[in-house]
Amino acid sequence: MNLSTLLLTLACISQLHGGSANQATDIMRRQLRMGKAVASLLENQHQSARELEENIMADEDNKANEVQADVSQFRVRRLRSPNYVELIELRG
């Protein structure tokens, strides 16, 4: 099991056990930042840790906060087993 899988597993477990989704999101973002810093450090060994942190924070600040999505409509169809459903996208 590699490190990123372990971190993702820990983040998911903390999200399930924690009461706040924002808290879990902050943990995942922090872990992602740390992973980016380590990867960037391995690629750019001549940079200092402070420069790496500033670059990563600038990259994160430039990203949009919301995900843009097109409106879609779906129809749910139950299959023979009550545990399975099929989503059919309606073309409009």
From Swiss-Prot:
Ranges spanned by the short sequence motif RxLR, renumbered to the chain: 30-33
| Bilayer-crossing regions | none
Q: Which UniProt keywords apply?
A: Host cytoplasm, Host nucleus, Secreted, Signal, Virulence
Give the GO cellular component terms, alphabetically. extracellular region; host cell cytoplasm; host cell nucleus
Q: Which residues form the signal peptide?
A: 1-21
What is the annotated localization of this protein? Secreted; Host nucleus; Host cytoplasm
Q: What is known of its domains?
A: Has the canonical translocation RxLR motif, but lacks the canonical EER motif, which characterizes most oomycete effectors identified so far.
Which family does the record assign? Belongs to the RxLR effector family.
Q: What does this protein do?
A: Secreted effector that completely suppresses the host cell death induced by cell death-inducing proteins.
Q: What is this protein called?
A: Secreted RxLR effector protein 21
Q: Which organism is it from?
A: Plasmopara viticola (Downy mildew of grapevine)
Gene symbol of the encoding locus:
RXLR21
